[in-house]
Amino acid sequence: MKKKALAFAAMACSVAMLLSACGGSNSNAASGDTAGSNIITAYNSEPQNPLIPGNTNETGGGKPVDLLFSRLVSFDKDGKASNEVAESITPNDDATQYTIKIKSGWKFTDGTPVTAESFTKAWSYVANAKNAQKCSSFFSAIAGYDDLQKDGLKGDEQLSGLKVVDDTTFTVDLNQSDSVFPIKVGYSAFAPLPESFYKDPKAFGEKPVSNGPYKLDHWDHNKEIALVKNPDYKGNEQPKNDGVTFKVYTDDSAAYRDIQAGNLDVMESVPAAFTKTFKTDKKVQAYSEAGSVIQTFTIPSSLDHFKNDEEGQLRRQAISMAINRDQLIDKVLNGNATAATEFTSPKTPGYSDSLKGADNLKFNASKAKELWAKADAISKYDGQLTFSYNADGGAKPLYDAIVNQLKNNLGIDAATNPIPTFQEFRDAVTNRQMKGAFRTGWQPDYPFAENYLWQLYSTAAADGNGSNDGDYKNPAFDDLCKQAAAASSTDDANKLYQQAEEILLNDLPAIPLYYSNASGVASLNVKSGYAFAWQNLPTYTEMSKK
């Protein structure tokens, strides 16, 4: 999420865009909704940025953005894509050009129509480096993207690969074949935007004009984001409730207690204090199934002694082998996760637990010490390695345990570095202020390996242009991902993505820890529709109190 940077609850918080703070009820988080209404109240963190689809890559903003904006395609509970705003998405023979026809009659909540230009201008705005949008790299496959990364732009230059044919038709020229493009456009960064956005993007982000199943009622910062049903919505996800109000919490245990008391309806995580008991708690409706979210930590590629060279690779491999993932899952997460074996997830087509280099993710303390000694022979390291995380998200038990394992199993000086809030934490990551390792994770934006790999570790997504927060760069990895995108079949693509992953398993730009279960709780007020979708998020539109 978004999507995005993930929210964490010591157990396995869902992330949709890279990390988002899982919290508990803040003293100013409002309690339940009006008695008898069918408004669903949902747990959330304060978004890092205004609610603009192309600048949202964490779950605090990603959850409301997903419900506010409809894209060309939507995904069902299992991740299957269906046309939504699109009437058709038709490739040419080699999938280097797509002709997209949109359905007539769609309109934004200000009454203006959704047209072909609503998409082409929005995509160009996100791609244009002048506008500094966090999801820019998602558009790197479209012709003209490189031209929009140059200095001296005004911000309104358009992608040359996008051509408007008429009000309901546009074409997309790509830099190379991409058979997965019709799935990618289901990500929120590909949402259309109304003309009012360009007049004042900042003001728009505070009260967006949208086209999705809900529209914004109000955003009371650090308290709640209230969405109400959009009566003009024409798409696939007709809400079975009257709205969703996202309550902002800074203490996830307090949020859980609000679920028990009926003052909050749903949260997509379980605090560490309740992971042993939530499945038998008669005051909540519990959910826990295998999920698609991966939890990791990242060591910046610019960090001395940890760069993408022989010394840095040895140290990263040593750190990874010194971590006993099964013990973390058993003792800290109470069994609500699965040890990571690669960089995607068991829910992703093409997943494998037997890739070359997978041994680097297995606990082996003696091998870890051997690799660390080899790195020291290249250049002695006597520093302290810090592990940063947002203190408002329940991550403390996990990172305390990781630091203790590294001290005991590898004999290095390691320490935690809690940062008070998720917003401060993400700002430090975004501004490249991290001087050590930091917590990361990924909730997929669409169900394909490319989303876990290219969007997180490609050169195109580095340097603030996407979600490559460690600024890892490897041309061989980039090339394999490009070959995979151009493959003629999904099977061929997955084989190439597996080869790309084997490079990551050697270089370890991030250290995979575990796959979070899709776990959460709902209040007893929720009468129907409570389940989790492929992104490890509740099925908000399906939930009802009636």
Q: Model-flagged regions — what are they?
A:
Residues 115-122, 167-173, 212-213, 241-243, ...:
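Alpha-helical secondary-structure segments
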Residues 520-546:
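Long beta-strand-rich cores associated with HINT superfamily self-processing modules
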Residues 173-239, 243:
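Gly/Pro-rich hinge or "lid" segments in bacterial periplasmic/extracellular proteins
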Residues 118, 127, 131-194:
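Surface-exposed binding/hinge segments that line
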Residues 43-93, 209:
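N-terminal lobe/hinge region of extracytoplasmic solute-binding protein
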